[in-house]
């Protein structure tokens, strides 16, 4: 097992356009480390095409002018290395987007290597698309690489490999692989194996937004260390999340997130209810082996991140500060093996439908845990049980390690009025 897989994956998404030039990122690294994050994921920093979208990369070896210090005479690559050094000084590892499903439609690559791209019947370079509510949505600023049928598969593969080696040389140690399921599994398998043969502890994470559970599993089998799961869209009730979790967990680990750069801000979705924001972070952190949150989540930001239009001027002044709470949740995650892995997990039915009872047991250690969560972020909800043995296998006493209002002793029979959105985190060890 790789070194990075021995502990929980805690990932802070520093969105480059909101953070501004690399020289200003230090304060965000300091805050991320203080909250207990080990990794910082940054979206693409390469030079974009005419659309200016972060994900429309025109030059994989150049840098986005919006992220460079205009007053500095330091070469761009050195500015990146200095930023990486700041992250490492804070005890953080850096992950970056790897975008090899497509590039910018105006990238020189479309002229220099026309054989690398999917073509329309009339010969034009194809743009990737998706279907939303039955409607075809085309990203006209993108050109789709033809990994499946190119006449020069080795040349295209070697180019992708050189991009990864370039980013590793800058100091990045992990890759969030954008639209991973749209790239052939055999390419991922070869790329990951070749990189890890030279850089053993490199971490690869598959972004699989919008694909089926089977596609997620098939992508995971290509050698990825983690995939992103769909817990963000769960309603705390339906069984599909556990089915998806169980389908993938034997293959690799997964990462939950309460919001991302692709979704609305959670604080906006819940109309500023911080009980709901805390509720979702606690669940996301403890449900799967990994957790990710984007910059600004800790302050209850409401304005969505945008891959073209976001700027440092969009930094919000709020009255919310969840940094201490997030640090406590991350400490719980790191402190118990059961939250480091894709543990066997079950949801127990309960007489009060507003209470979620999630059981987890480590497959590799003796840890066992219960999360008793008030689904209702507006009202108190009552939980009671004569004994906890109906929920856990261990006969050892339960300990309350909750991030807030932890109980010194767990009595039986047990009765507790959960505050709005509150979660009890109880742990024990099987004998």
Summary of predicted features, one role per range:
Residues 409-431:
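C-terminal beta-strand-rich structural cap/linker in extracellular carbohydrate-active enzymes
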Residues 37, 169-172, 224, 289-290:
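A structural motif
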Residues 301-347:
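Aromatic- and carboxylate-lined catalytic core of secreted/periplasmic carbohydrate-active enzymes
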Residues 230-259:
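Glycoside hydrolase catalytic-domain groove-lining segments
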Residues 387-405:
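Solvent-exposed beta-hairpin/edge-strand motifs
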Residues 2-151, 155-162, 166-169, 176, ...:
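Acidic/aromatic-lined carbohydrate-recognition and catalytic surfaces
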Residues 348-391:
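Carbohydrate-binding surface patches
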Residues 252-320:
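Aromatic/acidic polysaccharide-binding cleft in carbohydrate-active enzymes
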């Amino acid at each position: 097992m790789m070194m990075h897989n021995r502990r929980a994956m805690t990932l802070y998404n520093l969105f480059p356009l909101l953070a501004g030039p690399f020289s200003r990122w230090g304060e965000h690294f300091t805050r991320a480390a203080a909250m207990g994050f080990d990794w910082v994921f940054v979206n693409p920093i390469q030079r974009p095409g005419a659309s200016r979208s972060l994900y429309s990369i025109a030059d994989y070896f150049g840098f986005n002018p919006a992220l460079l210090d205009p007053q500095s005479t330091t070469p761009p690559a050195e500015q990146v290395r200095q930023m990486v050094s700041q992250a490492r000084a804070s005890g953080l590892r850096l992950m970056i987007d790897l975008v090899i499903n497509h590039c910018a439609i105006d990238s020189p690559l479309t002229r220099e290597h026309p054989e690398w791209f999917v073509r329309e019947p009339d010969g034009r370079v194809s743009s990737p698309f998706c279907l939303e509510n039955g409607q075809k949505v085309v990203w006209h600023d993108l050109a789709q690489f033809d990994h499946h049928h190119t006449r020069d598969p080795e040349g295209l593969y070697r180019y992708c490999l050189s991009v990864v080696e370039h980013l590793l040389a800058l100091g990045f140690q992990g890759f969030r692989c954008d639209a991973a399921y749209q790239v052939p599994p055999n390419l991922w398998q070869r790329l990951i194996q070749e990189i890890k043969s030279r850089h053993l502890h490199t971490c690869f994470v598959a972004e699989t937004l919008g694909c089926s559970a089977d596609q997620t599993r098939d992508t995971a089998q290509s050698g990825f260390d983690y995939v992103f799961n769909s817990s963000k869209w769960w309603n705390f009730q339906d069984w599909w999340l556990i089915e998806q979790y169980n389908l993938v967990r034997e293959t690799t680990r997964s990462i939950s997130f309460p919001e991302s750069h692709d979704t609305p801000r959670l604080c906006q979705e819940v109309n500023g209810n911080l009980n709901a924001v805390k509720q979702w972070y606690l669940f996301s952190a403890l449900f799967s082996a990994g957790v990710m949150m984007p910059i600004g989540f800790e302050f209850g930001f409401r304005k969505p991140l945008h891959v073209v239009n976001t700027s440092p001027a969009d930094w919000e002044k709020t009255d919310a500060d969840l940094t201490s709470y997030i640090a406590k949740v991350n400490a719980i995650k790191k402190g118990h093996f059961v939250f480091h892995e894709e543990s066997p997990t079950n949801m127990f039915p309960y007489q009060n439908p507003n209470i979620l009872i999630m059981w987890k047991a480590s497959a590799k250690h003796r840890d066992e845990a219960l999360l008793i969560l008030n689904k209702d972020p507006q009202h108190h909800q009552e939980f009671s049980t004569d004994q906890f043995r109906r929920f856990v296998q261990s006969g050892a006493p339960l300990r309350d390690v909750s991030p807030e209002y932890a109980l010194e002793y767990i009595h039986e029979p047990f009765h507790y009025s959960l505050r709005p959105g509150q979660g009890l985190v109880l742990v024990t060890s099987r004998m």
